[in-house]
Structure formats: structure tokens, C-alpha cells
Amino acid sequence: MTIPTVEIAGVPDPLPVAVLDVREDDEWAAGHIEGATHIPLSELPARLGELPKGQTLVVCKVGGRSAQAVNYLAQQGFEVVNLAGGMLDWAAAGRPMVSETGADAYVL
């Protein structure tokens, strides 16, 4: 199965789709896309009911974990696409992020 993937340049700003962040709690707290749903990859199978409806952009730090999530979720019938380059490319492109603490957001 081919994993649906998009590069940061192909992601509209503002985002017209939901975002699922599959990074760990400490990574999420340091910086994430505002409005994203956070479900760590290891918890995904047990939390499918919390997923956003409709097309969803799936992100992690560099694109590996999100590719695994997209592969799994697509098999479950979800309309998902992986962000190649992940949050590192998101931040490098100057896209907005927020942190859980109110401090300057960064990619951990």
C-alpha cells in the first residue's frame, strides 16, 4: 500500500483539514499545531473514536511515525495523509505553533 504523503509546500495556510499529531507527550507540550488532536502513536488503536472527522493531516517530528499511523488508519477506512518532513519542516517553513506552557513553541 502506498502511503498518501504531502510535502510542507503542498499544505495550504490556513489549514483546510484536521490535524492529528502522533508524537509523545513531551514533544507535544514543547510545540504543536494549534487545534491539532494529540494521540501518541502507541495509543492510536485504542483511541480511534477520538480521531477528527474527514480528511486529516497526520504529523510527527520527521514523518516516520506519522507514516505508520497513516498506513494503519487508511486500512481502518480513515481519509488521512502524512506530512513528509513532519514538524521539523513545519517549523522550518515558519508555520505557526503553540506550546502547552505558553513559552515559545519549538520542535523537540
Feature names for model-found ranges:
Residues 60:
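Short cysteine clusters
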